[in-house]
Amino acid sequence: MPRLLRYGSFSVVASVLGASYYYYAVASPLYTEAEWHRVSQRTAALIDRRIDIPVPESTTERREYVVRSSKETMKDIWNEQIRSIVDWIYSWSH
């Protein structure tokens, strides 16, 4: 008898938890409007090849890149920070 009662109570608790999960998470608009649900659906569609992966268009415009050493870059960052600190200090005097 205790074994039957234990299995019966486990079944009832599992059924109640399953039903509450279904009605709260799956059947309600909270589930279908959630951001993680949209991401999950989009990921599944990408995997199943139902939608295409967006590819940015390439341009044929010429671009100029300036390559500098990390030493010069650090000096520029340092100077910018010093200038902003000095501006902040002088802003208190006005």
Curated annotation (Swiss-Prot):
Topology within the bilayer: Single-pass membrane protein
GO cellular component: MICOS complex; mitochondrial crista junction
Pfam families, A to Z: AIM5 (PF17050)
Highest taxon listed in the record's lineage: Eukaryota
Keywords: Membrane, Mitochondrion, Mitochondrion inner membrane, Transmembrane, Transmembrane helix
GO biological process terms held by the UniProt record: cristae formation
Main location as per UniProt: mitochondrion
InterPro entries: Mic12
Chain ranges passing through the membrane: 7-23
Compartment(s) of residence: Mitochondrion inner membrane
Oligomer and partners: Component of the mitochondrial contact site and cristae organizing system (MICOS) complex.
Function of the molecule: Component of the MICOS complex, a large protein complex of the mitochondrial inner membrane that plays crucial roles in the maintenance of crista junctions, inner membrane architecture, and formation of contact sites to the outer membrane.
Family classification: Belongs to the MICOS complex subunit Mic12 family.
Protein name: MICOS complex subunit MIC12
Protein species of origin: Eremothecium gossypii (strain ATCC 10895 / CBS 109.51 / FGSC 9923 / NRRL Y-1056) (Yeast)
